[in-house]
């Protein structure tokens, strides 16, 4: 296995092979990663410039791609856009039984409300999402959005402390510090280099 340090090299290879499926997977992976560590300038153009509507996806793929684009909107501080898009995305997820994507979108929407200072709306959505996630222990979607939801989550936890919420707050704090280190080094985890092999 040869590791390529520059993702653009692999991207050009996919383009030369006319392998659009792999190119879209590659772009969506990098879009989500860079959105999570809040480096929107590095997000691939398909997502950064919000051109998903120009790509033909099979219907089952669409909610996940839209969820990734929501994360990009959050990283670009386009909070009202997240809220507006979620109004149509959540019913679509429910219709197709995409509970995990729906959970992510609920949390992203709560994050957008929190960033706009609408803490009541954020709290309602987070409490609903916590209720859905707790039985299965789905921590990561909350941790990934910790920076946006930490204040609202802390206020929920101060009223009714739960071990599940305590874990989110603890992991979220560590995650936030890790993201800051990554973005300050302008780097990416070695594991993503496997996508370039």
List where the protein language model places each region.
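Alpha-solenoid helical repeat architecture
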Residues: 1-2, 14-30, 41, 53-68, ...
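Intrinsically disordered and other compositionally biased segments
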Residues: 6, 28, 33-36
């Amino acid at each position: 296995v040869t590791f390529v340090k520059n993702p653009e090299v692999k991207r050009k290879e996919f383009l030369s092979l006319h392998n659009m499926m792999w190119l879209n997977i590659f772009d969506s992976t990098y879009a989500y990663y860079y959105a999570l560590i809040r480096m929107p300038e590095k997000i691939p153009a398909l997502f950064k410039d919000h051109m998903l509507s120009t790509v033909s996806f099979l219907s089952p793929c669409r909610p996940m791609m839209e969820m990734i684009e929501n994360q990009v909107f959050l990283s670009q501080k386009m909070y009202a856009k997240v809220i507006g898009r979620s109004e149509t995305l959540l019913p679509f997820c429910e219709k197709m039984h995409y509970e995990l994507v729906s959970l992510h979108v609920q949390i992203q929407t709560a994050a957008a409300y929190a960033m706009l200072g609408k803490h009541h709306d954020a709290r309602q959505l987070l409490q609903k999402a916590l209720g859905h996630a707790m039985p299965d222990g789905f921590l990561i979607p909350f941790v990934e959005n910790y920076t946006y939801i930490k204040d609202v989550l802390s206020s929920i936890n101060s009223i009714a402390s739960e071990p599940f919420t305590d874990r989110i707050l603890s992991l979220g704090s560590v995650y936030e510090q890790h993201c800051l280190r990554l973005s300050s080094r302008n780097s990416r985890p070695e594991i993503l280099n496997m996508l370039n092999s």
